């Protein structure tokens, strides 16, 4: 069926092949108990685990652990140029081997494919949405979402000539390089931002033109802390896909902002029920359930919004602090250390208003200094945001290129 569908839109001079007919596919194996086979010897065999690869990795170049040679017969040996697939975690994600080693039963290996496939082209073909859709279709009706040799063997792939495969893989590799380099730059900018924030919100570095001792304040005494109270709790049926007002929950927090596209909605009556939790631009939000202590500063609200029960609205009621400055304090180690002291080494699943009564901190003595600090950090956030937008654009371009190049809608030769 998939073969017939593919034939309707790929070029006439391409083939459509079933992977298992042109490659050898095997499942890994695990010597047990594994601890008895691990070794630190240089003579050990690389023991490949999902933890040995990062999010952007295409190649497996090293491993944290090795097994003794006697374990090879109870496992599966893989070699340079082989492709391995995770059959459960990172479902179906391919990697190219740059080393030799052994794989456990959480991996599948694809070998002896080079009669018809270029290595890098096969990597991208297996990474494509076309392949992922086939995996999903094969798993339909099953509660266990994992791969096996039989499923991967049935995967159908478009197959141009080797020279065209190499050209396609080269173009996709170039866009991958751009994406990886941009991710590295974003991580670097975030690290710099984190370090700058830490020294500015603690007063370890003062900005030019400001002096005077910082002032000790208590967050609760200088704030209005509000959340949805128990009797106002929402039922699942009240979580709407469209409605009058955004409903902000703890899962909507992302990188100091609210992911509006992921929010549910509530009707007008639920929004109007409690003005204390109606959200406006300039508000500071703090999660108090689940992953506690996540914080968001609201600056891009485009319609009414209200809170679910797991979120505090924190609003200044004195001139002791600005909400934007406090946002950065709550993002810093100052607040993280406070939460650690609250937990006393154990996990806390709820942040109470009475807990925040205990939170004392030092702030600049003037609003002007707080705003100057905020301005520097906001500019850094804006730069990171623009880079992340650029990254998202590159990722969308890559997906479009994969769709067009791997099906022959766009030809390179």
Describe each region flagged by the PLM:
Residues 404-413:
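Acidic, low-complexity, intrinsically disordered peripheral segments
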Residues 90-93, 290-294:
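Short, charged beta-turn/beta-strand-edge "cap" motif at the junction between a beta-strand
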Residues 85-86, 286-287, 379:
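A generic structural signal for residues embedded in beta-strands
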Residues 4-5, 20-37, 51-80, 220-237, ...:
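Sequence-specific dsDNA recognition surfaces
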Residues 2-3, 12, 87, 102-108, ...:
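A short glycine-rich beta-alpha junction/loop motif
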Residues 10-15, 122, 151-190, 194-195, ...:
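Amphipathic alpha-helical segments
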Residues 1-30, 154, 162, 208-230, ...:
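Non-catalytic DNA-recognition/assembly elements of restriction-modification systems
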């Amino acid at each position: 069926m998939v073969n017939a569908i593919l034939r309707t839109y790929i070029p006439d001079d391409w083939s459509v092949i079933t992977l298992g007919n042109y490659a050898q596919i095997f499942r890994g194996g695990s010597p047990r108990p594994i601890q008895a086979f691990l070794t630190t010897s240089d003579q050990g065999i690389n023991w490949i685990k999902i933890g040995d690869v990062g999010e952007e990795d295409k190649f497996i170049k090293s491993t944290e652990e090795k097994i003794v040679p006697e374990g090879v017969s109870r496992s599966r040996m893989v070699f340079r140029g082989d492709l391995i697939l995770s059959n459960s975690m990172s479902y179906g994600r391919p990697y190219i081997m740059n080393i030799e080693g052994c794989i456990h039963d959480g991996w599948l290996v694809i070998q002896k494919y080079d009669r018809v496939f270029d290595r890098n082209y096969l990597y991208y073909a297996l990474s494509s949405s076309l392949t992922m859709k086939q995996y999903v279709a094969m798993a339909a009706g099953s509660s266990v979402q994992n791969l096996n040799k039989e499923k991967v063997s049935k995967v159908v792939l478009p197959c141009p000539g080797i020279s065209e495969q190499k050209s396609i893989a080269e173009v996709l590799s170039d866009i991958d390089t751009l994406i990886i380099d941009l991710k590295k730059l974003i991580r670097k900018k975030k690290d710099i931002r984190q370090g700058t924030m830490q020294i500015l919100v603690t007063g370890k570095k003062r900005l030019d033109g400001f002096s005077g001792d910082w002032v000790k304040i208590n967050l609760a005494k200088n704030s209005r802390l509000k959340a949805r109270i128990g009797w106002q709790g929402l039922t699942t049926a009240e979580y709407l896909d469209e409605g009058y007002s955004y409903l902000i929950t703890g899962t909507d927090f992302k990188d100091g902002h609210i992911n509006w596209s992921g929010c549910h909605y509530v009707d007008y009556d639920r929004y109007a029920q409690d003005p204390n939790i109606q959200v406006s631009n300039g508000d500071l939000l703090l999660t108090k359930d689940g992953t506690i202590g996540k914080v968001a500063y609201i600056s891009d609200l485009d319609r009414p919004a209200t809170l679910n029960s797991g979120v505090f609205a924190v609003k200044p009621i004195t001139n002791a602090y600005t909400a934007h400055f406090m946002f950065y304090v709550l993002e810093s180690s100052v607040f993280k250390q406070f939460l650690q002291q609250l937990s006393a080494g154990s996990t806390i699943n709820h942040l109470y208003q009475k807990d925040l009564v205990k939170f004392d901190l030092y702030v600049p003595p003037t609003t002007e200094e707080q705003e100057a600090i905020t301005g520097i950090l906001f500019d850094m956030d804006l730069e990171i945001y623009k880079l992340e937008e650029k990254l998202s654009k590159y990722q969308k371009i890559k997906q479009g290129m994969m769709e067009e190049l791997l099906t022959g809608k766009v030809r390179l030769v």
